[in-house]
């Protein structure tokens, strides 16, 4: 125990008390009292130990005096009505031709609302219901019997709420409620920022909503879905894959595959981007990465989807790499290496699976590529997949009887899934554009819904294809295929 540190803390506590900074003074007093208590436990000589206990008692008395000062100052902040009525005889004689002075409004402190740690923010409909019960901003008056709360009462209430929150978190699963993550040691703002990135515990995207990509669906079922159904089988060398990397051109359905994985498994789905894990403050980005994986293990089974992972974990050792970026990459690699929730002694149903997507696989760091054990190629849709995409995108639109989706699917060869969706959207708007051509705004507003619900024709698709070109070139496809031949692991 450093005796100089004890003396320094006691000196600072007294100085802050003299300067009127009572909060800081109480912190130093608490720290030095705890230090003396620990030091007394290590002292063997009874005489020396008695002197230290006497010093501790004196500091406790000073600490209580500071607390009483704080309590007195807080009691001054509470408005109290006068103890005796104002006599009418003291008022000056009023002139009837002059307006009397306004009556001063009575200021009352708002009632203190106790909130538990597990309280979640209400939805919009809940907020509307609260507003319907009574006028907003009208607080109930405080009765005279209520006593002003002191700092000691606040500490006791806060301590009681923390204990209750921990107990509720442990019993949350048995009550059927979703337990709340206890982020002890982390900033509350960081936890709330990551909780906002929990897209949903059920994103409602199913395999049938994704056309084609049968090989990718099969691998993702094997990596995520089957370990949930057969936990006894996926043990030892058969443990589930720790990470899956989806490689392919933009707009081929990588994000929808990740959401379908979370839906089919019923897992908590974290949608993470580079902006989520970066901060301008030194060391906070590494904290965010570590906190993300701790929350994922708490809410397990979990799917962490990192979109555009090349922007977070690009190749290390380059000349233009910043030192802060290197620390974030190192923390991400460390957390991913220890994220295997289905190792020999762990429950596969409590696993955390990292699902990543990128359009630039050649920029990814080698160590990250090793941790993402499965690397699959998400190609452009085939002829069958293009026809299925047309049916999915046009299922809410009326089609002309003469239109053949198979013929249109042949014409859009080389288009990605996003390109096909844009073509369908543009073609479905062609009839509306023809109908409102030359009309004034008043005439457009007067149109009925039936006049705009016109079937989509083959000519509409031909016009849309003239306006929208494919976004992926043949050179890009060759580059992806070459990388998969060298580093693929399907």
UniProtKB/Swiss-Prot annotation:
The terms describing its cellular component in GO are: centrosome; cytoplasm; microtubule; spindle; spindle pole
If you read the UniProt record, what top EC class would you report for this enzyme, in one word? isomerase
Q: Name one GO biological process term.
A: microtubule severing
For this UniProt entry, the molecular function terms from Gene Ontology, in alphabetical order, are: ATP binding; ATP hydrolysis activity; microtubule binding; microtubule severing ATPase activity
Binding of ATP: at which residues?
Answer: 248-255
One family from Pfam that matches here is KATNA1_MIT
Q: Which family does it belong to?
A: Belongs to the AAA ATPase family. Katanin p60 subunit A1 subfamily. A-like 1 sub-subfamily.
List residues modified as Phosphoserine: 174
Assigned EC number: 5.6.1.1
Residue span of region Disordered = 87-182
Q: What residues bear N-acetylmethionine in this entry?
A: 1
Biased-composition ranges, Low complexity, are 128-139
Principal location: cytoplasm
Highest classification ranks of the organism: Eukaryota, Metazoa, Chordata, Craniata, Vertebrata
Query: Is Amino-acid biosynthesis found in the keyword set?
Result: no
What is the recorded name of this protein?
A: Katanin p60 ATPase-containing subunit A-like 1
* Basic and acidic residues bias (residue ranges): 116-127, 143-169
Localization of this protein: Cytoplasm, Cytoskeleton; Cytoplasm; Cytoplasm, Cytoskeleton, Spindle pole; Cytoplasm, Cytoskeleton, Spindle
List, alphabetically, the InterPro entries matched: AAA+_ATPase (IPR003593), AAA_lid_3 (IPR041569), ATPase_AAA_core (IPR003959), ATPase_AAA_CS (IPR003960), KATNA1 (IPR028596), KATNA1_MIT (IPR048611), Katnal1_chordates (IPR028594), KTNA1_AAA_dom (IPR048612)
Q: Which UniProt keywords apply?
A: Acetylation, ATP-binding, Cytoplasm, Cytoskeleton, Isomerase, Microtubule, Nucleotide-binding, Phosphoprotein
Q: What functional role does this protein have? A: Regulates microtubule dynamics in Sertoli cells, a process that is essential for spermiogenesis and male fertility. Severs microtubules in an ATP-dependent manner, promoting rapid reorganization of cellular microtubule arrays. Has microtubule-severing activity in vitro.
Catalytic activity as recorded in UniProt: n ATP + n H2O + a microtubule = n ADP + n phosphate + (n+1) alpha/beta tubulin heterodimers
Query: How the protein assembles, per its UniProt entry?
Result: Interacts with KATNB1 and KATNBL1.
């Amino acid at each position: 125990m450093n005796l100089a540190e004890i003396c320094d803390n006691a000196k600072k506590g007294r100085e802050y008390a003299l300067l009127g900074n009572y909060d800081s003074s109480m912190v130093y007093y608490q720290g030095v009292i705890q230090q003396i208590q620990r030091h007394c436990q290590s002292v063997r000589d009874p005489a020396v130990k008695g002197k230290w206990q006497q010093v501790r008692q004196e500091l406790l008395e000073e600490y209580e005096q500071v607390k009483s000062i704080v309590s007195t100052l807080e009691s001054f902040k509470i408005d109290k009505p006068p103890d005796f009525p104002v006599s009418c005889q003291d008022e000056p004689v009023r002139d009837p031709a002059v307006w009397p002075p306004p009556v001063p409004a009575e200021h009352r402190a708002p009632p203190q609302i106790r909130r538990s740690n597990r309280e979640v923010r209400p939805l919009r409909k809940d907020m509307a219901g609260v507003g319907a019960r009574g006028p907003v901003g009208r607080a109930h008056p405080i009765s005279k019997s209520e006593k002003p709360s002191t700092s000691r009462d606040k500490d006791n209430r806060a301590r009681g709420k923390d204990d209750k929150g921990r107990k509720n978190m442990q019993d949350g699963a048995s009550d059927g409620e979703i337990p709340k993550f206890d982020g002890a040691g982390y900033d509350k703002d960081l936890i709330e920022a990551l909780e906002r990135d929990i897209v949903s515990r059920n994103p409602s995207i199913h395999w049938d909503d994704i056309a084609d990509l049968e090989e990718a669906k099969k691998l993702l079922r094997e990596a995520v879905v089957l370990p949930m159904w057969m936990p006894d089988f996926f043990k030892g060398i058969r443990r589930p894959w720790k990470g899956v990397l989806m490689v392919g051109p933009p707009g081929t359905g990588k994000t929808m595959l990740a959401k379908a994985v979370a839906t089919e498994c019923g897992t908590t789905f974290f949608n993470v981007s580079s902006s989520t894990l970066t901060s301008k403050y030194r060391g906070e980005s590494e904290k965010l990465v570590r906190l993300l994986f701790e929350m994922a293990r708490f809410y397990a089974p979990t799917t962490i989807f990192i979109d555009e992972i090349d922007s977070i974990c690009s190749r290390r050792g380059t000349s233009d790499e910043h030192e802060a970026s290197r620390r974030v990459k190192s923390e991400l690699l460390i957390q991913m290496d220890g994220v295997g929730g289905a190792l020999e002694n762990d429950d596969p149903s409590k696993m955390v699976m990292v699902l990543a997507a990128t359009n630039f696989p050649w920029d990814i760091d080698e160590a990250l590529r090793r941790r993402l054990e499965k690397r699959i190629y998400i190609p452009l849709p085939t002829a069958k997949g293009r026809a299925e995409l047309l049916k999915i995108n046009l299922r809410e639109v009326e089609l002309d009887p003469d239109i053949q989706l198979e013929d249109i699917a042949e014409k859009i060869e080389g288009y990605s899934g996003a390109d096909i969706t844009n073509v369908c959207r543009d073609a479905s708007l062609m009839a509306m554009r023809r109908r409102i051509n030359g009309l004034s705004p008043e005439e457009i507003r007067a149109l009925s819904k039936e006049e705009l619900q016109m079937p989509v024709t083959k000519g509409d698709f031909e016009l849309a294809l003239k306006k929208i070109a494919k976004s992926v070139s043949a050179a890009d496809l060759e580059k992806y295929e070459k990388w998969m031949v060298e580093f693929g692991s399907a």
